[in-house]
Design a protein with these regions (language model features):
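Membrane-embedded alpha-helical hairpins and interfacial helices in multi-pass inner-membrane proteins
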Residues: 45, 120-193
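Hydrophobic transmembrane alpha-helices
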Residues: 2-71, 75
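Hydrophobic alpha-helical transmembrane segments
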Residues: 17-22, 50-51, 70-78, 94-95, ...
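Aromatic-anchored segments of alpha-helical transmembrane domains
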Residues: 24-32, 79-87, 125-135
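Interfacial aromatic-anchored transmembrane helix boundaries in multi-pass membrane proteins
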Residues: 35-40, 44, 80-110
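Short helix-perturbing small/polar motifs within transmembrane alpha-helices
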Residues: 29, 97-135, 185
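Membrane topogenic helices and adjacent juxtamembrane segments
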Residues: 1-35, 148-157, 161-172, 197-203
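Membrane-interfacial segments
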Residues: 34-42, 67, 71, 107, ...
């Protein structure tokens, strides 16, 4: 146990940073592919975070297995947030991923990045970061609309979103993210069993 704690507390090496960067790129692609179908439809866009969470679990968990040290997940989330922001997403979408990545890093760290259950919970929390923009949409729809119009979103798209939005959609969005990311984490644990055993990750 002491060796695991010491390993976790050691600073990130150049190799760790390179690995984190590579997996961040892969994770971004998988989240993008999973969510793009929903993002293009103003009615289904609320489920973009759920779609994004469906495919990326194995990549996320493999990153933890490769670099089971503090700050790797946080760095991944910050980089992803920056990419989302510069590609025209709402600032709250980017910020949501950044904040939840830090929270997810802390949760996985509680188990020294060796617990399948905590690592899976960490992924679920990270996936909830994608709801940031939609939370702002429900809290301040006019402000959200102005920001997105400035980012190039069409008025008709926003009008359809506002006509569709209700409390039921908000609740369904959170439930869907939790379900899809939990499934993705479960599949990831099954797929990466050998890698987890090598890294000393247990239930």
């Amino acid at each position: 146990m002491s060796n695991q704690v010491n390993s976790m507390n050691k600073g990130l090496t150049v190799k760790d940073l390179v690995t984190t960067g590579i997996f961040t790129a892969l994770l971004f692609v998988f989240v993008l592919v999973g969510g793009v179908f929903f993002a293009t439809n103003p009615v289904l866009t609320f489920f973009m975070p759920a779609g994004g969470g469906l495919l990326a679990g194995p990549i996320y968990l493999l990153l933890i297995a490769k670099v089971h040290k503090r700050w790797s997940l946080s760095i991944m989330g910050v980089i992803m947030g920056i990419i989302w922001f510069v590609t025209g997403m709402h600032w709250a979408f980017a910020l949501g991923y950044m904040i939840m990545a830090i929270v997810a890093d802390f949760v996985a760290g509680v188990g020294q990045y060796k617990s399948k259950e905590l690592n899976s919970l960490s992924y679920i929390l990270f996936s909830l970061g994608g709801t940031g923009s939609y939370i702002v949409f429900f809290v301040d729809p006019n402000g959200w609309a102005q920001t997105m119009l400035g980012n190039g979103t069409e008025q008709s798209y926003i009008d359809t979103m506002q006509a569709t939005a209700n409390t039921g959609i908000l609740i369904a969005m959170f439930v869907a993210v939790i379900i899809t990311s939990a499934i993705s984490a479960f599949v990831g644990c099954k797929m990466l069993k050998k890698q987890f055993e090598k890294a000393g990750i247990t239930a």
